[in-house]
Amino acid sequence: MIITPQELQKWLDDGKSFTVVDIRPEDHQKEFPLTGVNHVIATDDSIPITKNESVLICQFGIVTEGVIIEQNLENTFSLLGGAQAWNEFQSEKEDLSRWSRQTVLPEIGLNGQKRLLRSTVAIVGMGGLGCPAVQSLTAAGVGKLKIIDGDTVELSNLHRQPLFGHEDVGQLKVHVAKEKLEKTNEIAVIEATEEYLNKDNGLDFIRDADVIIDATDNIKTRQLIDKISKTSGIPMIYGGLYRYEGHVAILNSNGRPGYSDLFPEPLSGGNACADAGVLGMLPGIIGNIQALESVKLIVGIEPNLIGKLLIYDGMNHSTQLINL
């Protein structure tokens, strides 16, 4: 069973009778002492048996979950996020425990998670790339997501756009997406614009964004995103699909080239990537790579795809990385 720092604090405030057991190694206890709660110290093989509930605490809340399962402990809770999340909650009154599986990563940590919570990502298109990208970013804790698309859900979308179901056919994509994303993360701000991106609304749409995700299948719109990205100085994360192949690159960042620099002339062979057809799994992969690169940009993780083009071959599961 799991308990969050906020829930544990409520137990304390309500005067509930329970025992907190710190099973961390001695060096962790000394370096990161628990604050704001009385506790006993034990090892994972000498946990005291009590009549009331017990709350086990390790550094990140992972070890204690395993201990409870392995020892079949009853009336025992694992503190989600462990001592790290508890001490952060005590000092900042901000419960970050729901993201404990990513804050345990040293490249993310609590500071990286705070950057995500205070960030804004603009996503152009709620199709095969936009759906998985926005789902992952909402779950990861991005504070504000701005989505734009004037399209409605069609039956042919459902195999590659996992935000939508049969009951959503005929409804505006951004309205359905907003409703479902707010259920995924109730504290995220989802701003939905029920229009296609154009030269009149573009700059206003990306205003205050840290990153722009190009999740379109339309060359003209992609060129417009590139222009807006250059004008505003906001990096553009390009994603493209062709049959079993997918592309991702971070453009217009740190003086690196943009889409129009790479493709100064319109591409031949059709205006929409969708003309070639696609299996639903591939946009899921590419859209999630776009989301991953967004997180890396916001948090400041390297290496990333700034000035690089990643080519993924889904047929052979091979990749190429080209310097731009």
Predicted regions span which residues?
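Adenine nucleotide-associated cytosolic modules
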Residues: 1-4, 10-13, 17-19, 23-53, ...
